[in-house]
């Protein structure tokens, strides 16, 4: 197929999120909608339709804060489409965009599937060796079809219109009606097909995105005050993560200075004599002491550790993703940004909270390794 257009489904009530998903912040200064749009533009898609449902405020925000900031050439490739039939969910958005779309086929990307990649759509098109199809729809590891990540012909719009006058306006029902649907095995792409339904899903998806291009993934443990229990949380996490097979590093800030050597040792004497750096290697551990003019970058230290993941312990706001430690009933003193914070832990509830944290971190690490080495 010569040209593939892109439909971004950005509308929807987002009742579980409390705000439009499309405008949620993402990494690199992007929002979820600008992130999806950039994928289409970077793939040189010349026909991108953004479905906003019937949300005029959302459409205005996307136009003024995103589309108007693009180059003239990029702006010509993007159109906002409002639902011509109100309150029909994703199927209404699909109908409204297909009904006006000039391209021979459209990939559909839900705005709450931030790890979906354009390359997958082109791969799926290549796998179908004939043109007798109305839709190409992947199925996930669970065996369930994923119509929000499918490819559709515009001429099925008339069939979808007939469905919208009925009671069942689900995308899965629509697939049964339109027929000639090619199913694609996408069981190896569970993370790409995952979507963000709850705020917790969003927080951990951002955690993955923040860590995706780091040499060493990290997670910060912060607290607004001393003696809150940061070190207790860190040591508990280290123990539990090591137990499930992850090698863990710890970086800690100390603005008051510290001592890691013993008085009178050879390395201590060499350092006091003026050596800019000393190192010692034993059978089971290695230590390096470096003289600096100012405090070293904590982030740089995390990126040079030979481990799977680093925990950064600090009293500052930390580096996303962040776990914040509080005393019981003191959540009003939180210092981290809610968008960067994946968890809030009360020191008295470690037995309850740590296993869930470890599970999320394991899932993040598995997804990171799959995306880096697949």
Which ranges hold each PLM region?
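C-terminal accessory "lid"/substrate-recognition subdomains
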Residues: 213-215, 243-244, 263, 273, ...
């Amino acid at each position: 197929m010569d040209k593939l257009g892109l439909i971004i489904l950005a509308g929807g009530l987002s009742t579980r999120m409390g705000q439009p998903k499309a405008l949620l912040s993402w990494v690199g200064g992007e929002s979820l909608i600008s992130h999806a749009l950039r994928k289409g533009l970077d793939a040189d898609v010349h026909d991108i339709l953004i479905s906003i449902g019937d949300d005029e405020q959302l459409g205005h925000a996307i136009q003024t804060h995103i589309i108007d900031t693009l180059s003239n050439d990029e702006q010509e490739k993007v159109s906002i489409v409002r639902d011509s039939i109100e309150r029909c969910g994703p199927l209404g958005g699909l109908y409204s965009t297909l009904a006006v779309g000039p391209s021979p086929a459209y990939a559909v990307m839900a705005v709450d599937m931030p790890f979906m990649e354009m390359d997958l759509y082109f791969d799926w098109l290549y796998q179908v060796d004939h043109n007798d199809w109305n839709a190409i729809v992947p199925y996930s590891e669970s065996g369930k079809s994923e119509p929000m990540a499918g490819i559709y012909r515009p001429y099925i719009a008339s069939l979808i219109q007939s469905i919208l006058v009925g009671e069942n306006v689900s995308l899965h029902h629509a697939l049964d009606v339109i027929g000639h649907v090619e199913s694609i095995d996408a069981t190896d792409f569970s993370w790409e097909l995952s979507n963000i339904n709850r705020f917790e899903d969003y927080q951990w998806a951002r955690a993955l995105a923040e860590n995706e291009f780091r040499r060493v993934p990290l997670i910060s443990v912060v607290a607004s005050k001393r003696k809150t229990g940061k070190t207790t949380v860190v040591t508990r996490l280290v123990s539990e993560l090591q137990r499930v097979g992850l090698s863990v590093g710890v970086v800690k800030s100390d603005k008051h200075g510290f001592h890691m050597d013993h008085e009178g040792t050879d390395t201590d004497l060499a350092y006091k004599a003026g050596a800019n750096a000393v190192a010692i290697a034993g059978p089971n551990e290695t230590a390096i002491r470096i003289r600096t003019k100012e405090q070293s970058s904590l982030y740089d230290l995390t990126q040079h550790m030979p481990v799977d993941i680093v925990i950064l312990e600090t009293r500052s706001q930390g580096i996303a993703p962040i776990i914040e430690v509080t005393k019981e009933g003191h959540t009003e003193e939180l210092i981290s940004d809610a968008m960067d914070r994946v968890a809030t832990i009360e020191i008295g509830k470690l037995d309850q909270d740590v296993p869930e944290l470890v599970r999320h971190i394991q899932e993040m690490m598995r997804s990171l390794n799959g995306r880096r080495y697949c």
